[in-house]
Amino acid sequence: ITLPDRELACAPIDSPLGQEYLGAMRAAINCALANRQIVTHLVRQAFAEILPHADLSLMYDVSHNTCKVEEHRVGNQSRRLFVHRKGATRAFGPGHPDIPPDLQTIGQPVLIGGTMGTASYLLVGTAESMNMAYGSACHGAGRSMSRHQATRQWKGGKVIDDLAKEGILIRSPSKRGVAEEAPGAYKDVTAVVDAAEAAQLARKVAKMRPLICIKG
């Protein structure tokens, strides 16, 4: 394959290498899903020790940074496509057959996490997103600087103290990790969410502020 740029390296889907890539990616998605299930179980156990009758039900679980085989309208035809979502997640609109029955009339939940010090958002996919972006929306604001740059600008201990003054508790074994994830190292999540809604890629449902943040 002749490439106009080495960054566009690719492999035909039906080639052995292409199939190996898809298999490895799907294994990674399954690993991440299993990891989230384990974290959910541990959180439920922790809550049960203090609030034995608490019911922590899972609202939704969704993967991002994936490539999935989907049916979409291209022009006047329905086509089977491999949809790559990098820095993005599914945002299927109401009535899509891949949405769970209890969410069919609403649309697919879109979870957009903020930083340790900013809001996170719950959105839902739209019919317009299906037409414009193959049912896709952002899954976060994205970094405004590298982790290395963040550690040069912030100290983990100072970040923890500043967030504590705002009523946000941070728990992390690594102060360097906290510095890498400093709120200032990310773009404005509210501006990103507003832009996604203005573009009709997703619709805002709820805004949530952090109380406790656990960094691995």
Which residues does each predicted region cover?
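Domain-length cofactor-binding catalytic modules of enzymes
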Residues: I1-G216
